[in-house]
A protein has these predicted regions:
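Intrinsically disordered, low-complexity Pro/Gly/Ser/Thr-rich segments with frequent PxxP/GP/PP motifs
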Residues: 1-21, 30
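Beta-strand/loop-rich accessory regions of lumenal/periplasmic or secreted enzymes
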Residues: 12-21, 36, 50-388
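Short acidic/polar inter-strand loop motif in beta-rich domains
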Residues: 30-38, 445-447
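Short, compositionally stereotyped local motifs that mark structural "simplifiers"
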Residues: 389-475, 480-485, 502
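Disordered, acidic Ser/Thr/Pro-rich linker "stalks" and the adjacent N-terminal cap
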Residues: 453-510, 522-529, 543, 549-555, ...
Length: 570
């Protein structure tokens, strides 16, 4: 096929016998026909991978099990589970798999099992949002289990259910914007210990269920949500530290080069092998790397091939080094398994951050994975199973106070009760602005109870009726009420500069009793922040009377609260 020529080719699969347990792709390549000064004959000038057929569902991991998991032993806060060829412990204080041993080999050292993780060492393109991640404490999340239950199932498995709150003790800040002035000192996060986080500060709540099978396989199924659904995260998933000897990394997914949601189609779905740290591209400024999308399975083994089923450094170690030579000696293999990782976008020199489908808002995510023992040469066979563990009930309350329960099961009824009251079968969203303790379980399995506590909703959702001035596009007035601190309202400046005063009419969607006003300033700079303010209320949107509050806000990024002298109806 010559330059600028077009032809239709038909690929005939008629004589090819497909294995229904495998998925198939076809790779198309355009090769250089003759040697050129810039490349040899056969050089791949273009290639594409096209899907042909999907694999049939693999058998359930539970189907091949024999025997039963022994009754676990409880020693203090640890639940110890052991069987033929495996030992593992779970921590009732954190809701985590605390340690894991297969065949006498330590796979997870005590305290380094899977923990919720939403942080990454910022890339150059993350400058559209990275300043927020330390403020939210994503680098320093601490897990606290608020509910626990265990159950030996009829099919011989052990089920451990946890509700876990993950929150930092305080937020932090850094001087990353000054990196060109003193690059040796600006990459550290400085925690603000003077402002400890409270129950209303950013946190995750996870309902998670571990299932241990008789052969030592352990499955995690979780539902993860946060109390700030509009916040933009770099990732959401689990991280664990494994012994550094487990440094042979194999995976079936896109590769071999790092890829992200918005930069992945050039890397094909194949089985890839290599050493941890040598499969990635180290940049002059160490930063997040090694991500692979569309991964079906991954395996880590040592030189002998013994294993469990991946970077030499943690995200904080990568972030803290100005240059590669300043990275510390590796002490572990850091494995991340993520429900979603934010794309890179192009904000360092292009159109902005990732597009909406490639962002990771702090809303709800279902995620699960299965850990199994493997040996060299058996990886593919061990991975040909599907999860079978119980999946948790999701409890979500929206900004209007409506509480909903969702599950991945179409025909399983959910039963709930509030503040220890009468159990009720869930039929429709429940008004729940006053908050309280909620317990929920499947009607056919009362042994696994998910528990979550919601605080009383004090704020009144607002909509905008009128705005005297706004910069259309990214800085419109809709951002004043979108509950997203990364966006902001700015008065017009592109066509003309609007003069003071500026005003906005808000609608509370009915008469409400109000006792104050909360204002979140622009987070990434002073332009557009409010200095002097006056607050008026009205019953009809026409007659406003005298201001019920007025004053001056400080020029900073901290949330401001104005308490009225007495509650008012508006």
């Amino acid at each position: 096929l010559g330059p600028r020529e077009r032809k239709t080719y038909t690929l005939d699969y008629g004589n090819y016998r497909f294995d229904p347990t495998k998925e198939y792709f076809v790779k198309i390549q355009f090769l250089l026909a003759e040697k050129q000064p810039w490349a040899d004959k056969g050089y791949v000038q273009m290639e594409e991978q096209l899907p042909v057929s999907e694999a049939a569902p693999a058998p359930s991991v539970a189907a091949a099990q024999q025997g039963r998991v022994a009754q676990p032993k409880v020693e203090g806060n640890l639940v110890k589970v052991s069987g033929k060829g495996y030992e593992m412990t779970f921590d009732k204080l954190t809701g985590r798999l605390y340690s894991l041993n297969y065949g006498g080999q330590t796979i997870i050292k005590p305290g380094f099992g899977p923990k919720l993780d939403a942080f990454r060492a910022r890339t150059d393109n993350d400058n559209w949002m990275d300043y927020r991640w330390p403020q939210l404490g994503l680098h320093n999340l601490k897990d606290k289990a608020t509910a626990f239950a265990q159950q030996l199932t009829k099919d011989g498995a052990l089920r451990l259910s946890f509700t876990v709150e993950s929150q930092a003790p305080y937020g932090g800040r850094d001087n990353y914007s000054n990196r060109d002035r003193n690059p040796e000192t600006v990459y550290k996060i400085v925690d603000d210990k003077s402002k400890p986080f409270g129950p209303d500060d950013f946190k995750f709540t996870t309902n998670q269920i571990y299932t241990v099978y008789p052969d030592g396989s352990v499955e995690l199924q979780s539902y993860i949500t946060s109390n700030q659904p509009s916040v933009q995260l770099p990732r959401i998933g689990y991280a664990m530290e494994l012994p550094k000897e487990l440094n042979r990394f194999a995976y079936y997914g896109r590769g071999p080069v790092n890829n992200y949601r918005d930069r992945k189609t050039g890397q094909f779905v194949e089985e890839h092998h290599g050493l941890v740290g040598e499969q990635d591209i180290m940049l002059p400024k160490p930063q997040s790397m090694g991500n692979r999308e569309d991964v079906r399975w991954c395996a880590l083994t040592d030189a002998q091939g013994n294993s469990a089923s991946a970077l030499p450094w943690s995200a904080l170690e990568l972030m803290g080094a100005a240059h590669p030579y300043q990275l510390p000696a590796s002490t572990a293999t850091h494995l991340h398994l993520d429900a979603k990782v934010a794309g890179l976008g192009g904000n360092s020199c292009g159109q902005g951050g990732p597009l909406k489908p490639d962002c990771v808002p702090g809303e709800g995510y279902r995620f699960g994975f299965l850990i199994r023992p493997v040996t060299n040469g058996q990886t593919a066979a061990v991975t040909k199973v599907t999860p079978a563990g119980e999946r948790p009930i999701a409890m979500v309350r929206d900004t209007n106070g409506q509480l909903t329960f969702t599950t991945p099961y179409a025909k399983r009824a959910v039963v709930y009760r509030i503040n220890g009251g009468k159990p009720q079968e869930y039929k429709a969203p429940v008004p729940f602005r006053d908050g309280g303790k909620v317990e929920a379980w499947y009607k056919d399995n009362k042994a696994a109870v998910a528990t979550q506590t919601f605080h009383k909703i004090e704020n009144v959702p607002l909509s905008v009726l009128f705005c005297s001035s706004q910069e259309t596009g990214d800085n419109g007035i809709e951002h004043a009420v979108d509950n997203d601190p990364s966006t902001f309202w700015h008065t017009m400046y592109s066509v003309t500069v609007a003069q003071y005063p500026h005003w906005v009419d808000f609608d509370a969607n009915g008469t409400k009793l109000m006792k104050g006003f909360v204002y979140v300033p622009r987070q990434d700079g002073p332009n557009g922040r409010i200095k002097d303010y006056e607050i008026y209320v009205s019953q009809d949107g026409k007659n406003w009377g005298a201001p019920i509050a007025k004053g001056t806000f400080p020029n900073g990024s901290k949330q401001q609260r104005v308490d009225f002298a007495q509650p008012v109806r508006a």
